[in-house]
Amino acid sequence: GTRMKIIFVRHGEPDYRELEERFYTGFGMDLAPLSEKGRQQAQELCQNPLLGSADILVSSAVTRALETAFYVSCATGLPLRVEPLLHEWQVLESGVENFEKARTLFLENNGKLLPHCPIQYETAEEMRARFIESMAKYSDYQKVVVVTHRMLIRQFVPNETIDFCQVIECEIEI
Protein backbone atom coordinates (compact mmCIF):
# COMPACT_ATOMS: atom_id res chain seq x y z
CA GLY A 1 0.00 0.00 0.00
CA THR A 2 0.86 3.67 -0.22
CA ARG A 3 0.76 6.17 2.61
CA MET A 4 -1.49 9.07 1.75
CA LYS A 5 -1.60 12.40 3.56
CA ILE A 6 -5.22 13.30 4.08
CA ILE A 7 -6.67 16.57 5.25
CA PHE A 8 -10.13 15.67 6.51
CA VAL A 9 -12.76 18.40 6.54
CA ARG A 10 -16.19 17.88 8.04
CA HIS A 11 -18.98 19.63 6.09
CA GLY A 12 -20.63 22.83 7.38
CA GLU A 13 -23.92 23.00 9.28
CA PRO A 14 -26.83 21.78 7.14
CA ASP A 15 -30.42 23.04 7.14
CA TYR A 16 -32.90 20.15 7.14
CA ARG A 17 -36.08 22.18 7.73
CA GLU A 18 -37.53 22.07 4.23
CA LEU A 19 -37.01 18.31 3.96
CA GLU A 20 -38.33 17.60 7.46
CA GLU A 21 -41.49 19.57 6.68
CA ARG A 22 -42.05 17.27 3.72
CA PHE A 23 -41.17 14.11 5.69
CA TYR A 24 -38.17 13.11 3.59
CA THR A 25 -36.18 10.23 5.07
CA GLY A 26 -32.99 8.27 4.40
CA PHE A 27 -30.95 9.53 1.46
CA GLY A 28 -33.69 12.13 0.90
CA MET A 29 -32.29 14.02 3.90
CA ASP A 30 -28.94 14.17 2.13
CA LEU A 31 -30.41 16.74 -0.26
CA ALA A 32 -30.20 19.34 2.53
CA PRO A 33 -28.09 22.42 1.71
CA LEU A 34 -25.93 24.30 4.18
CA SER A 35 -27.63 26.72 6.54
CA GLU A 36 -26.67 30.41 6.56
CA LYS A 37 -24.31 29.60 9.43
CA GLY A 38 -22.95 26.60 7.49
CA ARG A 39 -22.07 28.81 4.52
CA GLN A 40 -20.27 31.17 6.89
CA GLN A 41 -18.35 28.22 8.39
CA ALA A 42 -17.35 27.11 4.89
CA GLN A 43 -16.10 30.60 4.03
CA GLU A 44 -14.03 30.80 7.23
CA LEU A 45 -12.67 27.32 6.55
CA CYS A 46 -11.20 28.58 3.27
CA GLN A 47 -8.75 30.78 5.19
CA ASN A 48 -6.99 27.67 6.51
CA PRO A 49 -3.54 27.61 4.82
CA LEU A 50 -3.37 23.80 5.06
CA LEU A 51 -5.97 23.43 2.32
CA GLY A 52 -3.85 25.16 -0.30
CA SER A 53 -1.00 22.71 0.32
CA ALA A 54 -3.01 19.80 -1.12
CA ASP A 55 -2.94 18.48 -4.70
CA ILE A 56 -6.61 17.65 -5.13
CA LEU A 57 -9.96 18.03 -3.40
CA VAL A 58 -12.26 15.03 -3.01
CA SER A 59 -15.81 15.36 -1.69
CA SER A 60 -18.67 13.16 -0.61
CA ALA A 61 -21.53 13.44 -3.13
CA VAL A 62 -23.91 14.44 -0.33
CA THR A 63 -25.11 18.04 -0.77
CA ARG A 64 -23.86 19.42 2.57
CA ALA A 65 -20.35 18.12 1.82
CA LEU A 66 -20.36 19.10 -1.84
CA GLU A 67 -21.52 22.64 -1.06
CA THR A 68 -18.71 22.94 1.52
CA ALA A 69 -16.21 21.58 -1.02
CA PHE A 70 -17.38 24.11 -3.60
CA TYR A 71 -16.21 26.97 -1.34
CA VAL A 72 -12.84 25.25 -0.83
CA SER A 73 -12.44 24.65 -4.57
CA CYS A 74 -13.22 28.28 -5.41
CA ALA A 75 -10.80 29.58 -2.76
CA THR A 76 -7.90 27.22 -3.49
CA GLY A 77 -8.32 26.48 -7.19
CA LEU A 78 -7.92 22.77 -6.39
CA PRO A 79 -9.54 20.38 -8.86
CA LEU A 80 -12.69 18.85 -7.35
CA ARG A 81 -13.65 15.18 -7.60
CA VAL A 82 -16.90 13.75 -6.27
CA GLU A 83 -16.91 10.32 -4.61
CA PRO A 84 -20.33 8.76 -3.98
CA LEU A 85 -18.88 6.23 -1.50
CA LEU A 86 -17.75 8.93 0.93
CA HIS A 87 -21.32 9.32 2.24
CA GLU A 88 -22.13 9.27 5.95
CA TRP A 89 -22.37 6.13 8.05
CA GLN A 90 -25.33 3.95 7.07
CA VAL A 91 -28.08 3.09 9.53
CA LEU A 92 -30.65 0.85 7.88
CA GLU A 93 -33.63 2.12 9.88
CA SER A 94 -34.39 5.75 9.04
CA GLY A 95 -35.18 8.57 11.43
CA VAL A 96 -33.14 10.69 13.83
CA GLU A 97 -33.97 8.57 16.91
CA ASN A 98 -32.78 5.38 15.24
CA PHE A 99 -29.62 7.14 14.08
CA GLU A 100 -28.81 8.28 17.62
CA LYS A 101 -29.70 4.88 19.11
CA ALA A 102 -27.52 3.15 16.51
CA ARG A 103 -24.69 5.57 17.22
CA THR A 104 -24.78 4.72 20.92
CA LEU A 105 -24.71 0.98 20.10
CA PHE A 106 -21.91 1.49 17.58
CA LEU A 107 -19.75 3.32 20.15
CA GLU A 108 -20.57 0.86 22.97
CA ASN A 109 -19.64 -2.11 20.76
CA ASN A 110 -16.47 -0.52 19.33
CA GLY A 111 -17.93 -0.27 15.84
CA LYS A 112 -19.06 -3.88 15.66
CA LEU A 113 -22.58 -5.06 14.92
CA LEU A 114 -23.55 -7.70 17.46
CA PRO A 115 -25.85 -10.58 16.45
CA HIS A 116 -29.57 -9.91 17.15
CA CYS A 117 -28.93 -6.16 17.30
CA PRO A 118 -32.32 -4.35 17.09
CA ILE A 119 -30.92 -1.79 14.64
CA GLN A 120 -28.82 -2.77 11.64
CA TYR A 121 -25.94 -0.42 10.83
CA GLU A 122 -22.66 -0.27 8.97
CA THR A 123 -19.68 -1.51 11.02
CA ALA A 124 -16.43 0.40 11.53
CA GLU A 125 -14.67 -2.15 9.35
CA GLU A 126 -17.17 -1.70 6.50
CA MET A 127 -16.82 2.08 6.71
CA ARG A 128 -13.03 1.96 6.61
CA ALA A 129 -13.09 -0.46 3.66
CA ARG A 130 -15.50 1.77 1.74
CA PHE A 131 -13.27 4.79 2.34
CA ILE A 132 -10.05 3.06 1.32
CA GLU A 133 -11.63 1.57 -1.79
CA SER A 134 -12.93 4.98 -2.74
CA MET A 135 -9.55 6.70 -2.20
CA ALA A 136 -7.35 4.07 -3.91
CA LYS A 137 -7.64 5.86 -7.26
CA TYR A 138 -5.95 8.94 -5.74
CA SER A 139 -2.82 7.09 -4.58
CA ASP A 140 -0.63 9.10 -6.98
CA TYR A 141 -1.41 12.30 -5.09
CA GLN A 142 0.80 13.37 -2.17
CA LYS A 143 -1.85 15.22 -0.22
CA VAL A 144 -5.62 15.12 -0.57
CA VAL A 145 -8.34 17.26 1.01
CA VAL A 146 -11.37 15.07 1.75
CA VAL A 147 -14.68 16.77 2.59
CA THR A 148 -16.88 14.20 4.26
CA HIS A 149 -18.83 13.23 7.40
CA ARG A 150 -18.22 12.90 11.12
CA MET A 151 -18.66 9.15 11.64
CA LEU A 152 -16.51 8.32 8.61
CA ILE A 153 -13.73 10.69 9.72
CA ARG A 154 -13.84 9.19 13.24
CA GLN A 155 -12.76 5.81 11.87
CA PHE A 156 -9.35 7.31 11.06
CA VAL A 157 -8.71 9.93 13.74
CA PRO A 158 -8.80 9.79 17.55
CA ASN A 159 -10.99 12.91 17.94
CA GLU A 160 -14.10 12.24 20.04
CA THR A 161 -15.91 15.26 18.65
CA ILE A 162 -15.53 16.78 15.21
CA ASP A 163 -17.14 20.16 14.63
CA PHE A 164 -18.65 21.51 11.44
CA CYS A 165 -15.85 22.50 9.04
CA GLN A 166 -13.17 21.20 11.41
CA VAL A 167 -9.88 20.35 9.68
CA ILE A 168 -7.91 17.27 10.78
CA GLU A 169 -4.70 16.08 9.16
CA CYS A 170 -3.65 12.44 9.15
CA GLU A 171 -1.82 9.74 7.20
CA ILE A 172 -3.56 6.62 5.95
CA GLU A 173 -2.34 3.42 4.36
CA ILE A 174 -4.24 3.06 1.08
Model-derived features: positions:
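Acidic, low-complexity terminal tails and accessory targeting/binding regions
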Residues: 3-5, 48, 81, 85-103, ...
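Active-site-proximal alpha-helix that buttresses catalytic centers in soluble enzyme cores
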Residues: 5-81, 166-168
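Generic beta-sheet signal
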Residues: 6, 55, 140-150
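Short, active-site-adjacent cap segments at secondary-structure transitions
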Residues: 15, 65-66, 89, 152-154
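Phosphate-handling substructures
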Residues: 18-19, 28-33, 74-130
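Short amphipathic alpha-helical/adjacent loop interface patches that line ligand
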Residues: 42, 131-132, 150
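Short, well-ordered beta-to-alpha junction loops that form the rim of enzyme active sites
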Residues: 59-63, 85, 147-151
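A short, acidic, amphipathic alpha-helical segment used as a generic capping/interface helix at domain edges
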Residues: 127-139
